[in-house]
Structures are given as C-alpha cells and as structure tokens.
Swiss-Prot record:
The keyword Glycoprotein applies. Odorant receptor. GO terms for molecular function: G protein-coupled receptor activity; odorant binding; olfactory receptor activity. Disulfide bonds join 96-188. One of its GO terms (cellular component) is plasma membrane. It is a multi-pass membrane protein. Glycans are attached at residue 4. Belongs to the G-protein coupled receptor 1 family. The chain crosses the membrane at residues 25-45, 54-74, 99-119, 139-159, 196-216, 237-257, 271-291. This is Olfactory receptor 5M8.
Amino acid sequence: MRRNCTLVTEFILLGLTSRRELQILLFTLFLAIYMVTVAGNLGMIVLIQANAWLHMPMYFFLSHLSFVDLCFSSNVTPKMLEIFLSEKKSISYPACLVQCYLFIALVHVEIYILAVMAFDRYMAICNPLLYGSRMSKSVCSFLITVPYVYGALTGLMETMWTYNLAFCGPNEINHFYCADPPLIKLACSDTYNKELSMFIVAGWNLSFSLFIICISYLYIFPAILKIRSTEGRQKAFSTCGSHLTAVTIFYATLFFMYLRPPSKESVEQGKMVAVFYTTVIPMLNLIIYSLRNKNVKEALIKELSMKIYFS
C-alpha cells in the first residue's frame, strides 16, 4: 500500500544529456521533428475529413492513428524541449502521473488501432464483395471505440499501481519523461506487484494485438497472390507493406522497452529507444501510411491546387 509519509512532491528529469552544446543541437532537431509531426498529422486528419472519396474505413482508421500519434508525441516532446532549455528540469508528482497515464493509455490505443487496421485490410482483400456491408459506419465506430476505452482503463490501472508506491528518497528520473521503468526504481516501497503487473500487461497486450495482426496476414498474403492483375497485386502489397513496416518498427521498440525487468542498463538503453518511438515514429507513420498512398497524395494535390487557384 502507498505510505502516508510520501515526501517527494516533484521529480527531476535528467534528460538525454547534460552537455549544453548537445542540448541546443537536440532541441533544434526535436523541435523540427515535432513541428513536422504536428503539422503533418493535423493536416492528414483535416484532409481525410474534407475529402468525400477518403471517407472509407481505411482512411477513417488512418485519421485516428494520426490523432493518436499527435497525442503521443505531444505528451512527451514539449516537456523534453523544455528540459533542453531550462535550468530547472523538474516535473511535479501529479504531472508525472498524468504523463505516465497518457503514455500507457496511448500505447495501448495505438497497438490495437494497428490491429484493427490489419483486420480492415483482411476484410478488404479477402472479402471484397462483403467489405462495404460488413465494415459499415457503425462497425467501424465500434472497432475504433474499443481501443480508446481499453487503453484508458489499462492506463488507469497501471497508473494506480504507480500511485500506490511510496517515493521518499531520490527523485532524479534517468529519462526525458516520466516512464515507468526508471520511475519505479526510485520507489522506497516494494515494487514487485507493479513490476509484475507491468510485465504481464505489456506482454499480454503486445502479444495479443500482434497475434491479431499475424492471423490477418496469414489470410491476406494467399489472397493477394490470387489477384490476377499485376496492378491489383502491387496495390495490395504496397498497402500491406506500409502497415507491416510501421508494425515492425513500433512493436520491436516496445518489446525491447517493456519486456525486461528494470535495471540501470535497461533504463539507459530504453531511454535511447524511447527517443525513437516517442518522437520519430509518430512522424514516420505519417510518411509510411500517408505520403506513399496514391489517394492521399491526389487529395493533397487537389487541396493545394484549389488554395493556389483561389489565393
């Protein structure tokens, strides 16, 4: 149980480096990445909403992936940028818990949206004649609501485990945001239940969502090979290839981060990996899923042409 004598009211985030010249360089780099991520994902959401021919299940799910990536990056990057410039690198205890909650919730929302997108591709490629009726607006709304609700509840459960820990001593977190592994290393109460819960929840959700994706593709690949037209096969492989690329990158980093017990070495390595999936992946998803998509590019060109014409 959480002790009443908890003394820590704020934590110090050590960030990525203490070298001033590197901090300025990294600030510039991550600010540029964040601006591209925000502008790109917001633009993608608006583009899909504004163009009627993009009102299909695939783009509906893509718009939600863009929204989650935007939230994912915004939960971490602004504080990281502040740490690069500020002498006081602190975060309050409540703010730390909120950041932990949002991170855990958004990770689970994203992995299940990726699973839903795999199922959507299965329906489109393996059952094209029934796709329109079975992937109705109500079905799509249900499929996208489940990840949000489940992610919110899972994040709350895991954050409550952290809240029940007592932090009475050191308050320096060896990270650039409030991540569970380095945070629980600072607890002065028993962390066994929290570590066990973290391992089980991460292991189960990563494995189960990946299982859904793998099963979907076990049906998708044979169906693609049966497509007679070369253009049809190339289009199907291109769509699935983009999805598999994003899945591989995202899941590999998460498995590396969470399926190991916290230690000094794992925290240091995890910090480097976390840079990639909290700042770079939200930008990469935009490129992988959107800018390689013919319909999205055509819609973007049309919107830009109209703005130039009316300006």
